[in-house]
Amino acid sequence: MSRLLLNCDIGESFGSWTMGLDAEVMPFIDCANIACGFHAGDPSIMRKTVSLALSHGVKIGAHPAYQDLVGFGRRSMAYTAQELQDILHYQIGALDGICRAQGGKVSYVKPHGAMYNDMMANPAQLRAVIQAVVAYDRSLPLMLMATRDNTAAQQLGDEYGVTLWFEAFADRAYDSAGRLVSRQLPGAVHHDCETIIGQALTIARGDNLTASDGSALHLQANTLCVHGDNASSVAAVQRIRQALNEQSAP
């Protein structure tokens, strides 16, 4: 079984408002996707989250979004390709500066929410995102959604010489095309701990998932997204980490 990197969306608090159990989940993940202020987070939260990640030896990823604090970055917005690249550079650069001030660095980029979904549905937008990463730092991998067929995205990444990390989700339902089922639909998010752990191990083994229409779905992924929103989800992350370590042990 190939080793999957565990990643988690982190640093999504804002001011005195707290979201997520970042300190509790950080010891069990490989990569922290840190909000950059447009959908969540602020300069102080970003600094504290970077410090936490560095203290645990966790890779830091920029988690940029549309400028949508009210909608938590989950609403599609119309941007030109240049405007999209501008907001990506603004957010990646902000986090990178905070990292450098603490002796760290941004190691990859993972767009958030609607931006993440939109770039998977629109090849022109994916191209614009890749161009933004190339212009900032070609060595940064771009994390994007693993689907039934990663070929088109991989070809675009190869065209620009960008490393792509394909991501699967332990706690989300998939449709037959390998896209995430909309959060507006029932059953889109798994809440049962055993279901989440089972899906994580199925993906790690390279076995087929069952899509929402009952069809078999194979996802070829490099990294697995987990969440630490509450005590039960943190417990699930801990068990996934332990199970993956056991599965990959010689």
Swiss-Prot record:
<comment type="subunit">
    <text>Forms a complex composed of PxpA, PxpB and PxpC.</text>
</comment>
<protein>
    <recommendedName>
        <fullName>5-oxoprolinase subunit A</fullName>
        <ecNumber>3.5.2.9</ecNumber>
    </recommendedName>
</protein>
<keyword id="KW-0547">Nucleotide-binding</keyword>
<keyword id="KW-0378">Hydrolase</keyword>
<dbReference type="InterPro" id="IPR005501">
    <property type="entry name" value="LamB/YcsF/PxpA-like"/>
</dbReference>
<dbReference type="Pfam" id="PF03746">
    <property type="entry name" value="LamB_YcsF"/>
</dbReference>
<dbReference type="GO" id="GO:0005524">
    <property type="term" value="F:ATP binding"/>
</dbReference>
<dbReference type="GO" id="GO:0005975">
    <property type="term" value="P:carbohydrate metabolic process"/>
</dbReference>
<dbReference type="InterPro" id="IPR011330">
    <property type="entry name" value="Glyco_hydro/deAcase_b/a-brl"/>
</dbReference>
<comment type="similarity">
    <text>Belongs to the LamB/PxpA family.</text>
</comment>
<dbReference type="GO" id="GO:0017168">
    <property type="term" value="F:5-oxoprolinase (ATP-hydrolyzing) activity"/>
</dbReference>
<comment type="function">
    <text>Catalyzes the cleavage of 5-oxoproline to form L-glutamate coupled to the hydrolysis of ATP to ADP and inorganic phosphate.</text>
</comment>
<keyword id="KW-0067">ATP-binding</keyword>
